[in-house]
């Protein structure tokens, strides 16, 4: 039995066996027959004995078999016409060894092309056949197994996945996905753009003619692919990278997107699409352009005309880089977008939403666990009205411009950041142009929750990670911050320590973990006259009798020092303090209301002028109850501003002692029972003159 031809059992397999035997002998299937007591053997050349799984030459034997026996490699056959001795075929002797050997699979025959496959009529449901290639142009990577589906009488012959014979029978690929290799994607002689378009067309046509459910995803094997032109995909088609896939768009024409997710037909419901439009399994779906200075953009999502809604688009594990605009959004019927675990880097603008004709767009655009880095101009730039975007657990790393930038046409919109990390921007954290109209400005807002901001410049210039640096200039735009880890690492080197511009409407709560606290907004300053503007020029504080001579402040104590209110020209009204190593201590005349939830911040700004010695600055707060009784006094360690003026690493060191520099802020928590307070500012230790231009108390958080 060692030389038997092993074949599957059952009636369904008989025709398949005949086909296989016919190919081995180079004869027609009709020349192969089974030895059976009910079948006339005269029409056949090769006889197959099913019980021993062996093949025999019929020779001159005729008639219908009655009985047969195999002895010593010979078959004695008794038929209605007599007794005959049949010779065993040589192929039968060698076949088992060839098929079960290491290269046995290569001995199985294949259909040469789709054209040939159309001429082969299947006979049994589930019958399989191997196609060598779609055609010689696309190559052998396009081949594969096809199965006969007798239940299908409607599928269209698409030339790749469904092949229809002359009698209407359908050979179909059994896979539950579409492999872009079937369209020539792995053949370097084939334009990848053609392979992409052909694969996408099959799925798109299925959705158009049959419906979304039942449509297959397109798989793209690991490798690098170089399309010659823009790749388009409807929002209801999925392309999934298996492993690391790179779409190299460096050879594309100017003003192309490497990939556009766009609908070109109307009337297709995209309501229930929830699959990845672009995604990756076990790797990254990488999209490359022709460098930042080229004119090729990354991915476009949206409609440019009134077509089927581009909704529920999902990007997963997609990386975009080396392009002008990383991810661009359209503005017609484009909404409910999600990007997860994606990366956008080395762009002019990372996420770009231009101002075009807008209709039914911008609802719940979401980014989760994404990184946007290396943007030359801005990480995010929005001009389109009505674009609501949410960033959660995202990182924004290094840009020569702003993290977020809203133009004058941006409005009717909310942008939110939750648990995000910002680092290394040369411009601003948040920037917005003045709105085109008051209605636009009043309908836009920015919300930030649990944010970490390491604000050093992309160029990492010394001093730029300082609390002197403005971070927010969102003109007429409310900014709500709840939880900010602002990591300034450099002392102030300018007169003011403002987080936002005067034109920004800022609400902040939970400002934490910063050794150099900023004044969030001028609206949070508690003491009127913080810039000495209310004081009378010429007022002298130099004796016990005149300790209370200032308008807004009381000199509560002094030693070997006196002060005079002077005019500083463009620098404004100032308090010039003259000392000989003593101290000078001012407090507000009026009480400042507080609650136990308040954290009070204090700083002062000064110019060192001709002074020598240490310039010690100390802050304290006297807390009072509802009946004006002193509860306690909180003090902070002193700050030697001489070391700041002598710091050669600060950007404005060359301006010398004429600079006005703010002290680092000191903060105090109101004790239980406190309902009001009087902040105190003290300077001491120097000889000569200094000018004080700011004495600020502010609510840091509430």
Curated annotation (Swiss-Prot):
It is found in: Virion. One of its GO terms (biological process) is adhesion receptor-mediated virion attachment to host cell. Keywords: Degradation of host capsule during virus entry, Degradation of host cell envelope components during virus entry, Host-virus interaction, Viral attachment to host adhesion receptor, Viral attachment to host cell, Viral tail protein, Virion, Virus entry into host cell. SUPFAM superfamilies: Pectin lyase-like (SSF51126). GO terms for cellular component: virus tail. Its main location: virion. Transmembrane segments: none annotated. Functions as a receptor binding protein (RBP) and probably mediates the attachment to the host capsular exopolysaccharides. Displays a depolymerase activity that specifically degrades the K11-type polysaccharides of Klebsiella pneumoniae capsule. This is Depolymerase, capsule K11-specific. It comes from Klebsiella phage K64-1 (Bacteriophage K64-1).
């Amino acid at each position: 039995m060692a030389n038997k031809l092993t074949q599957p059992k059952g009636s369904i397999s008989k025709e398949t066996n005949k086909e296989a035997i016919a190919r081995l002998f180079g004869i027609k299937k009709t020349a192969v027959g089974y030895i059976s007591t009910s079948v006339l053997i005269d029409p056949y050349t090769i006889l197959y004995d099913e019980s021993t799984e062996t093949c025999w030459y019929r020779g001159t034997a005729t008639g219908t078999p009655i009985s047969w026996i195999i002895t010593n490699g010979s078959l004695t056959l008794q038929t209605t016409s007599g007794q005959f001795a049949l010779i065993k075929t040589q192929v039968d002797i060698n076949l088992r060894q060839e098929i079960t050997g290491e290269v046995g699979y290569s001995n199985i025959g294949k259909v040469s092309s789709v054209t040939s496959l159309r001429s082969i009529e299947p006979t049994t449901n589930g019958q399989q056949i191997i196609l060598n290639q779609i055609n010689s142009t696309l190559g052998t990577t396009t081949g594969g197994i096809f199965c006969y589906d007798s239940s299908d009488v409607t599928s269209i012959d698409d030339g790749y996945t469904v092949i229809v014979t002359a009698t209407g029978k359908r050979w179909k690929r059994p896979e539950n996905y579409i492999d872009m290799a079937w369209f020539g994607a792995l053949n370097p002689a084939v334009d990848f753009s053609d392979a992409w378009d052909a694969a996408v067309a099959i799925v798109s046509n299925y959705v158009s003619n049959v419906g979304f459910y039942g449509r297959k995803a397109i798989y793209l094997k690991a490798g690098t692919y170089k399309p010659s032109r823009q790749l388009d995909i409807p929002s209801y088609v999925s392309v999934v990278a298996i492993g690391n896939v790179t779409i190299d768009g460096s050879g594309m024409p100017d003003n192309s997107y490497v990939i556009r997710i766009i609908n070109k037909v109307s009337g297709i419901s995209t309501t229930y699409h929830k699959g990845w439009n672009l995604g990756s399994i076990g790797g990254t779906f990488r999209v490359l352009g022709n460098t930042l200075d080229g004119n090729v953009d990354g991915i476009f999502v949206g409609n440019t005309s009134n077509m089927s809604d581009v909704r529920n688009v999902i990007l997963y594990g997609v990386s975009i880089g080396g392009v002008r605009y990383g991810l661009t959004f359209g503005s017609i019927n484009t909404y409910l977008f999600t990007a997860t675990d994606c990366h956008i880097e080395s762009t002019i603008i990372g996420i770009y939403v231009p101002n075009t004709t807008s209709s039914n767009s911008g609802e719940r655009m979401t980014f989760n666990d994404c990184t946007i880095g290396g943007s030359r101009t801005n990480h995010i730039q929005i001009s389109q009205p009505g674009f609501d975007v949410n960033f959660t657990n995202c990182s924004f790393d290094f840009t020569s411009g702003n993290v977020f930038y809203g133009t004058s046409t941006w409005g009717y919109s909310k942008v939110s950041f939750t648990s995000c990390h910002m680092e290394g921007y040369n411009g601003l954290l948040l920037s917005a142009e003045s709105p085109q109209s008051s209605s636009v400005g009043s309908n836009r807002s920015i919300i930030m929750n649990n944010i970490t901001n390491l604000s050093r410049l992309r160029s990492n210039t010394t001093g730029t990670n300082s609390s002197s640096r403005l971070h927010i200039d969102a003109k007429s735009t409310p900014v709500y911050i709840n939880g900010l880890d602002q990591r300034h690492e450099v002392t102030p080197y300018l007169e003011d320590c403002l987080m936002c511009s005067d034109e920004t409407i800022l609400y902040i709560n939970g400002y934490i973990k910063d050794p150099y606290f900023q004044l969030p907004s001028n609206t949070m300053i508690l003491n009127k006259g913080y810039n000495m503007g209310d004081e009378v020029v010429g007022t002298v504080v130099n004796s016990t009798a005149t300790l209370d001579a200032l308008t807004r402040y009381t000199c509560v104590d002094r030693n070997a020092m006196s002060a005079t209110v002077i005019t500083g020209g463009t620098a404004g009204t100032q308090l010039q303090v003259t000392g000989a190593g003593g101290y000078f201590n001012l407090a507000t005349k009026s009480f400042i209301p507080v609650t136990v939830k308040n954290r009070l911040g204090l700083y002062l700004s000064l110019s060192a002028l001709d002074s020598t010695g240490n310039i010690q600055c100390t802050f304290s707060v006297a807390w009072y109850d509802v009946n004006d009784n002193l509860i306690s006094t909180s003090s902070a360690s002193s700050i030697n501003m001489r070391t700041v003026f002598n710091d050669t690493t600060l950007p404005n060191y060359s301006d010398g002692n004429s600079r006005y520099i703010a002290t680092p802020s000191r903060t105090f928590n109101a004790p239980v029972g406190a309902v009001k307070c009087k902040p105190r500012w003290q300077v001491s230790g120097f000889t000569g003159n200094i000018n004080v231009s700011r004495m600020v108390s502010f609510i840091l958080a509430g």
